[in-house]
Amino acid sequence: DAARDAGGLLDWGDHEARTLEDMGYPNWVAEKGLCPGLPDWTALKNPDCAANFVTPDSGGKGRWLEGPQSWHQDLMPQRLEALGLDDLWMVKFAGGADALWAELEAAEKEGRGTIIFNWTPNFTDGAGFTFIDFPPFYDGCRPEDGGDGACGSPDGYLKKAVNENFPNTHPQAAAIFKKMSFTTSHIGAMASLVDIDGMTHEDAAAAWLADNESVWKAFID
């Protein structure tokens, strides 16, 4: 909004995909029955659930693997305490995104549960990932805003924008971009081709276009 209001950019609509950054789990956690009741956050109150997420560094508690502490400071430890989950769960801070992805692979190989910080859309949407349903976010629910932190994260939009001159200099491209709208599964599949299958961006784009002709043709008709 600030960039648009400063001038030079035009709001060109939103993608269908919504954005979210929060704690969740790979779908195989639910498929293995490691925490019955998920994605409802109250399932985390069950000691038998927490026991399936214990790691050598978690002191006997179930572990949430957060991103680096610089990302959100103590947001997740505060949430655990506010929801009354800190007797059963603890937060470990990862060194970066690569550590989060390595944890997904390690946990599946070891057959143990894992709850990690993640965001959508990204490649994990293609593999299958579910965010925990925490109490809804509302303005003022976080500690820095006067709340107790017993709330999840807000979802958001995935915005499109163009240079203010673009519709005049490239009217056909501008019209196509205006109609373009990707879903979470579309973007997850694209990202998976690069992050999981190891394709170059160019090869991934070609593969996705070949497999999704009905999607992109709707943008150019």
Language-model segments: residues:
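C-terminal lobe and pocket-closing loops
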Residues: P121-S181
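A conserved helix-loop-strand patch within extracytoplasmic ligand-binding domains
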Residues: A2-L65
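Ligand-binding pocket segment of bilobal, Venus flytrap-like solute-binding proteins
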Residues: G60-Y138, P143
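Soluble non-cytosolic domains of exported or imported proteins
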Residues: C35-L38, S70-D74, A94-D98, P167-P171, ...
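Surface-exposed patches in mature extracellular/periplasmic domains of secreted proteins
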Residues: D11-W12, F53-D57, L88-A94, A189-L193, ...
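A residue-level marker of the well-folded mature domains of exported/periplasmic proteins
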Residues: H15, L34-T42, P47-A50, D57-S58, ...
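C-terminal functional modules
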Residues: A174-D221
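A bilobed periplasmic-binding-protein/Venus flytrap-type ligand-binding module shared by bacterial periplasmic
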Residues: E21-L34, D155-T169, S192-L193
